[in-house]
Amino acid sequence: MSRKKIVLAGAGQIGGTLAHLAMLHRLGDVTLLDVNANPPKGKALDLSHAAAVEGCDAVLTGTADQADIAGADVVIVTAGVPRRPGVDRDALLAINLPVMESIGTAIGRYCPDAFVICITNPLDAMVWALRRFSGLPPARVVGMGGVLDSARLRSFLAEALGVSVTEVQAMTLGGHGDDMVPLVRQATVGGVPLPALVKMGWITQQAIDDIVQRTRTGGAEVVNLLWTSSAYYAPASAAIAMATSYLGDQKRVFAASAALSGQYGVDGLHVGVPVMIGAGGIEKIIELEFDDEEQRQFTRSVAAVAALVEDCKRLHRGLA
């Protein structure tokens, strides 16, 4: 049986990390695509040597020719300008929108049956534009953001509670930005609701509030520490988990930026919600019940995403 083909559109730090993880997880052959052929070729060559150490027979190649993505089973899009200190996701929109047009058009032309995962920021607007440019159905284009934000929330909660992160279940919904909605009320630790742990004295409400705020600014915290780049290990791990669920028909549930058509009262936008990913792509969108405060926060987050989408339409008439 032939191996699957994984295309990584963007061969920067996230792209290189994705390629390494895809090789280690034996997901299939890997093609790194970038505007200049040498960096992806260099990383592919280096990773081929690493594959020999790992005993992996995957074929890793680098290219600048978009035609080389033909027949891809999965495309993970990281291309574009990453965040820098003092530059928020919104400021990246005008720069990265043309990149989404180029890659989206290539996906629609060369691999229209692929499952596409977008990492490029501002994520919810970029995945919306990518789907429009590609012409792919909504179930086959998804944004990674909520998986990463939820992982940060789970990590911070596990650290504060002194428990294994595997015991913490928590989701962050809404847009992948400062208005995201960490659902701490619905979080559990070993099956015990987080509010119950507050009553038991395991953690204070103030500590939870601080964790919520740190989750919202987690990306900026990494950017400010790295200075010359944004996060790349965690985003790559998140995207690989999504790709693995698709390729293996695992039907895992993730908080991810999906195209909504009436769910949560939202239509025509990509917003972070719980989705089940299997061989059919996004196979289910799970609608949770919010309390009044959660609904208020979610509505505000959706409004922020909608504003970015309107900016996309203003910048590119073809999206209007």
UniProtKB/Swiss-Prot annotation:
NAD(+) binds at G10, A11, G12, Q13, I14, G15, D34, N96, I119, T120, N121. It catalyses: (S)-malate + NAD(+) = oxaloacetate + NADH + H(+). It is an enzyme of class 1 (oxidoreductase). Its EC number is 1.1.1.37. One of its GO terms (biological process) is lactate metabolic process. It holds the Pfam family Ldh_1_N. Keywords: NAD, Oxidoreductase, Tricarboxylic acid cycle. Gene3D superfamilies: Lactate dehydrogenase/glycoside hydrolase, family 4, C-terminal, NAD(P)-binding Rossmann-like Domain. Belongs to the LDH/MDH superfamily. MDH type 3 family. This is Malate dehydrogenase 2. It comes from Rhodopseudomonas palustris (strain BisB18).
